[in-house]
Regions:
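The catalytic Nudix box helix
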Residues: 92-127, 141, 145
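Short functional micro-motifs and their immediate structural scaffolds
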Residues: 40-43, 61
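Active-site-adjacent beta-strand/loop module that shapes the phosphate/pyrophosphate-binding cleft
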Residues: 129-152
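N-terminal strand-loop-strand
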Residues: 33, 50-93, 97-98, 119-120, ...
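Nudix hydrolase/Nudix homology domain
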Residues: 1-32, 87-91, 155-191
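Short linker/helix segments within small regulatory modules
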Residues: 44-49
Length: 191
């Protein structure tokens, strides 16, 4: 997995995304040799990106997990964090996966509360980005702080979180992520 991460910064951007998407699809096809329902061999469908079981008629589609990226605003400040695990050491925004039975807006509120102990309001959808590195569909949201700005860090998930003034927001010039785009938009006063 670590080797494939180099493709996220490959230029032009479309090449990196194509390679990562191909990697995701390759891994999915390799892991879908047999039906999860009856155990018989699966065959690729001729028209759709799916695997089909001729024996029990079961169909299997690639897994895509919905996840949110959250830009929490507090006036001219943006909440930024660093993950506790993994290899990424750059600043990011609050993020997390949607749970079963949960709307994306509920996911935004839950993730912010879980990771930094803050309440938010005025949740606004920005845009989405496929993220094949984690088989996710990332959906970006901006929202406003509601109440106290006192951060209560969830140390199992984050190593740090802090408020940055608009002009102080750090970002990686070579990153092609939705997170980076949202940070730059806020820095430029567009969000």
């Amino acid at each position: 997995m670590e080797d494939i991460i180099i493709f996220r910064n490959l230029g032009p951007q479309v090449n990196g995304f194509a390679l990562i998407t191909g990697y995701q699809l390759h891994n999915w096809y390799e892991s879908r040799k047999f039906c999860g329902k009856c155990g018989h061999p699966l065959v690729p469908d001729a028209r759709e990106r799916m695997m089909y079981c001729p024996h029990c008629k079961n169909t299997e589609y690639p897994k895509i997990s919905p996840a949110v990226i959250v830009g929490v605003r507090n006036g001219n400040r943006l909440l930024m964090s660093k993950y506790a695990g993994g290899t990424a050491r750059r600043y990011a925004l609050i993020a997390g996966f949607a749970e079963i039975g949960e709307s994306l807006e509920e996911t935004v509120k839950r993730e912010v509360m879980e990771e930094v102990g803050l309440k938010v309001k005025n949740i606004e959808y920005y845009k989405s980005q496929p993220w094949s590195l984690s088989s996710s569909l990332l959906m970006g949201f901006y929202c406003d702080l509601e109440g106290s700005d006192q951060i209560v860090l969830e140390e199992d998930e984050l190593s740090e979180a802090q408020w940055f003034e608009r002009e102080e927001i750090p970002y990686d010039d070579y990153d092609v992520s939705l997170t980076r785009e949202m940070m730059i938009r806020f820095k430029k006063g567009l969000a």
